[in-house]
C-alpha cells in the first residue's frame, strides 16, 4: 500500500497537523490547559496559526522536489508552479503571524513567522540543501527558542 506521503493532498496537512500537535496541543495539555473549555479558546487560534506556519515553511520543500515527486502527488508546485506556490506559502505565513499576534500573549511565534517570510520568498528558485535543512527546518527550533526567550522577558 501507499504511505501517507504518497497520497495526493495529504502530505502537507499531515506534516502541519503533526507539528501542531507536538508544539501546541500536547504542551498545552501537559500544562493542564483544557483546550476544549471556552475560556481557553485562544489555544485553538494558536493551533490554527501554527498549522498555517508549518504549512507555509513546508511548501518550499515541495518546490525543491517538484522534479523528483511523481506527477500523481499533485503538489502545489506541480499544479500551480513555484511562484504561485511560494506566494500561497507567504500568504499562509502572513495569516499565521497575524493569528499569533491576536491569540498568543507570547510574541515569539509571531516574530519567527515574520522572520520566515524573506526566507520562504528566497526559495522560489532552487537553493542549496543547507537552505532547507538549516534555515527552513531551523525555523521550527527557532520558534521554540523564541517562545522561551519571550516568556523570560515578560
Predicted features along the sequence, with ranges:
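Transmembrane alpha-helical segments that form the membrane-embedded catalytic/substrate-channel core
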Residues: 1, 21, 50-63, 118-125
Amino acid at each position: 500500500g501507499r504511505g501517507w506521503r504518497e497520497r495526493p493532498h495529504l502530505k502537507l496537512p499531515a506534516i502541519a497537523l503533526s507539528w501542531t500537535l507536538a508544539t501546541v496541543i500536547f504542551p498545552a495539555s501537559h500544562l493542564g490547559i483544557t483546550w476544549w473549555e471556552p475560556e481557553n479558546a485562544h489555544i485553538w487560534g494558536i493551533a490554527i496559526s501554527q498549522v498555517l506556519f508549518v504549512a507555509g515553511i513546508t511548501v518550499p520543500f515541495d518546490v525543491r522536489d517538484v522534479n523528483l515527486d511523481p506527477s500523481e502527488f499533485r503538489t502545489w508546485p506541480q499544479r500551480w508552479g513555484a511562484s504561485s506556490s511560494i506566494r500561497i506559502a507567504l500568504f499562509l505565513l502572513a495569516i499565521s503571524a497575524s493569528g499569533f499576534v491576536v491569540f498568543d500573549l507570547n510574541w515569539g511565534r509571531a516574530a519567527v513567522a515574520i522572520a520566515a517570510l524573506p526566507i520562504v520568498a528566497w526559495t522560489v528558485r532552487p537553493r542549496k540543501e543547507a537552505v532547507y535543512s538549516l534555515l527552513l527546518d531551523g525555523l521550527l527550533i527557532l520558534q521554540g527558542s523564541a517562545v522561551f526567550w519571550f516568556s523570560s522577558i515578560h
